[in-house]
Amino acid sequence: MATVPEPTSEMMAYYSDNDNDLLFEADGPKQRKCCVQPPDLGSLGDEGIQLQISHQLYNKSFRQVVSLIVAMEKLSKCTYSQYFQDDDLRNIFSLIFEEEPVTFETCADDFVCDAVVQSLYCKLQDKEQKSMVLASPYVLQALHLLAQDMSREVVFCMSFVQGDENNSKTPVVLGLKEKNLYLSCVMKGDKPTLQLEALDPKSYPRKNMEKRFVFYKTEIKDRVEFESALYPNWYISTSTAEQRPVFLGQSRGGQDITDFTMETLSP
């Protein structure tokens, strides 16, 4: 602990108007000042603190300077590294975090089903500009419509769902707006068949749809085509003939029409 020497007869009288002012001799114009220079921590050893007289101006009281020196001396006795290195940070982390092995688990499909499904409304016409209409409760047909009959054209609700991870195409399901009917692919006899299937609107559409409802949408310039996810290389198709049912076919670019124009509608 630093100590302030006791006053003796050899010490001169000083006066000051303010604690923050310099100390001057009471009887002379020499204006001899007394202040303490901050110690160099690198030079401090076991010998204690060395007080020095300096001619530099400090706007601090003598009591404040002595308190600062005592505090600096206590800090100088603390053990510390000159540079903060990576090992120091690693040691801190080891005290806070505990390393444990990470295991991966496959999530149940229920969580995927709860995900929000993004959808849009659209109309589809084949390359011959035939529109799709609902000919009976569960049959879609493609035919040319006159202007006064365009209200018969089916509006699809296209929902974006989960597909195979290894497939880069866009998986979608196609439902009829406000009818709870969805296009699906089923095997009838020995041939995949396209049909309309009614679903509970409280449960569908959902992110993880059954594979028979899923189609992979591919865009080719300004046209789109829809391939069955359950039956690869089978596509939603229309006939070149008028007023025939929409079906599932394999003849791309042949007699059957597999490419469509899509008109996106506002919600």
From Swiss-Prot:
NADP as a keyword of this entry, yes or no, is: no
Q: Where in the cell is it found?
A: Cytoplasm, Cytosol; Secreted; Lysosome; Secreted, Extracellular exosome
- Record keywords: Disulfide bond included? no
Which UniProt key words apply to this protein?
Cytokine, Cytoplasm, Inflammatory response, Lysosome, Mitogen, Pyrogen, Secreted
Q: Show the propeptide residue ranges.
A: 1-114
For the site labelled Important for interaction with integrin, the residues are 169, 177, 179, 188, 202
Listed GO MF terms? cytokine activity; integrin binding; interleukin-1 receptor binding
Q: What does this protein do?
A: Potent pro-inflammatory cytokine. Initially discovered as the major endogenous pyrogen, induces prostaglandin synthesis, neutrophil influx and activation, T-cell activation and cytokine production, B-cell activation and antibody production, and fibroblast proliferation and collagen production. Promotes Th17 differentiation of T-cells. Synergizes with IL12/interleukin-12 to induce IFNG synthesis from T-helper 1 (Th1) cells. Plays a role in angiogenesis by inducing VEGF production synergistically with TNF and IL6.
Q: How does it assemble?
A: Monomer. In its precursor form, weakly interacts with full-length MEFV; the mature cytokine does not interact at all. Interacts with integrins ITGAV:ITGBV and ITGA5:ITGB1; integrin-binding is required for IL1B signaling. Interacts with cargo receptor TMED10; the interaction is direct and is required for the secretion of IL1B mature form. Interacts with HSP90AB1; the interaction facilitates cargo translocation into the ERGIC. Interacts with HSP90B1; the interaction facilitates cargo translocation into the ERGIC.
General remark = IL1B production occurs in 2 steps, each being controlled by different stimuli. First, inflammatory signals, such as LPS, stimulate the synthesis and promote the accumulation of cytosolic stores of pro-IL1B (priming). Then additional signals are required for inflammasome assembly, leading to CASP1 activation, pro-IL1B processing and eventually secretion of the active cytokine. IL1B processing and secretion are temporarily associated.
Q: Which family does it belong to?
A: Belongs to the IL-1 family.
Q: What is this protein called?
A: Interleukin-1 beta
